[in-house]
Structures are given as structure tokens and as C-alpha cells.
């Protein structure tokens, strides 16, 4: 998949790609380049679509060794009692290979029967899996993994016993998404994959090189 059927000049496309990597909003990029905001927004969407496509192509990669699992919630207005989840929020499940990449998936809920198929499909048997004490991870105790739990009420990190990596990703993703001041729910998976890409592919220079290749600009 690449960016095609775009009426913008190639030099404008390249500048938009550079601005995207630098986290310049589409509106600001449009102002700088003297183009219509809708044109910049549409091009940014095309970048996200290409990015999501290529990340999906890579999603068959199996994580092994030490892996961290966690779930988080994005958007919406928190209602009711505080705790796991909230009305109007989007649930996201994350799997991080410690020292490596993160994989994310929007999920309808965070029940064990929803998460376990994702876990067994993505993580190699005999891997060491770190989670918090959420009950949905209880099934890992009788799985083909070595399961270690983190009790946040008593400690945050102790040596290798932590899930700081995946929690760092959540913080980074929410920082990136906060500047958009609201994202349509149907578009959220594309923005999530943008965050996954930024986390997995190093410096802006590296990201630009990869996106030039993926988009064929």
C-alpha cells in the first residue's frame, strides 16, 4: 500500500510527510505551506492509513523473552466509580517486548476471553510475562508462559519486576493524542497505530526514511 491519486505537488507531499514526523498538526502545516487545511488533513489521514497497513503486515512477528502486558483507556468522559475502564472510553490492549517493539489492539472489552487469544497468538511459549494484578490475567497462571504480577498498591518497580515499558508507551501515546483535542471513535485505530509507529521506529530521521519508503513519495 502506498499514497496514490494525490493532486498535491510532490514537494508539498514531502514537506507534509516531514511535518507529520515532527508532530506538526495538519492545520499548522497547511498554514505554513499555504494549502487548504482539508488537503493537509486528508494527506495526514493517508499517511496514517499506509502506516496502519504496514504495521498490520508486521503484526505476525512473535514476541519472546521478557514481555509486558497492560490495557489502557482513551478518550471519552469518565463516569461512575473510578477503576478499570469508563463509559465512553476506548479500551486498548498492549503487548511490549522488553527492549523492543510494542503491539497495540483496540478491544471491545478487557475480559480474559478477549485478551488471551491475542496473548497466545503474539507471544512465544515459555516467555516471561509481566502484568499487574488485574483478574483478566489470572488465566496466565495456567498457561504456557511464566507469569509474574506487579502489585501497584505495594510497589511500582523492583528490579526486573515491573511493567514500566508498556506504561511509558501509554504515557507517550496520550501525549501525542492530546494535541488533537478529540478524535472520532472510528478514526481512533489509525491514530493509535501512529503512536505505535512513533514508539517502535526510533528517531524522526529514521521515521521519515521508513515513511518515504512505505508511502513511496
Language-model features, listed with the residues they occupy:
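Residue-level recognition of single "structural anchor" positions
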Residues: 1-217
